[in-house]
Amino acid sequence: MAAAIQALLVLALLHLATATPVIGKQTVSTLSTGYLGHPVVGGLGYGGLGYGGLGVAGLGVAGLGYGGLGYPGAALGGVYTHHAAGLVHPYGGLGYHAAPYHHALGGLGYPLGIGAGVVAPHVVKGKIAAPLAPVVAAI
């Protein structure tokens, strides 16, 4: 199980490294489709690892992710993921151990917890999605 999770984390990091910002209702990821990254491929994209999508080893909630203003994500270990008006995302997910919510900067925003304390915030300014570099924090 640990090896499988490690492999998924490597895939997620590769995915983040190749993500391309786009405008409007197109992809914000090479592995996502739909408005602001609705997960469709193996739970990766902007769901899967941390919230939404299929999750890791089926721990997420299939069919849910972030499109439009966003939808509730995954429930993991009894911690429920919730979306509030596209601005604040209190949630529980794999690897996100910081504050219980994330404020968007200048519009829509949604963090992606990918395990082991690695957090990759994605911030939307206007209609342009701008993935930021992953931040490795001791949290």
Swiss-Prot record:
Subcellular location: Secreted, Extracellular space, Extracellular matrix
Record keyword Signal present: yes
GO molecular function, one term: structural molecule activity
Sequence repeats: 42-46, 47-51, 52-56, 57-61, 62-66, 67-71, 92-96, 106-110
Alphabetized UniProt keyword annotations: Extracellular matrix, Repeat, Secreted, Signal
Record function comment: Self-aggregating protein that is part of the soluble form of lamprin.
Oligomer and partners: The polymeric lamprin chains self-aggregate to form fibers and have secondary structures particularly rich in beta-sheets and in beta-turns.
Protein name per its UniProtKB record: Lamprin 0.9
Biological classification of the source: Eukaryota, Metazoa, Chordata, Craniata, Vertebrata
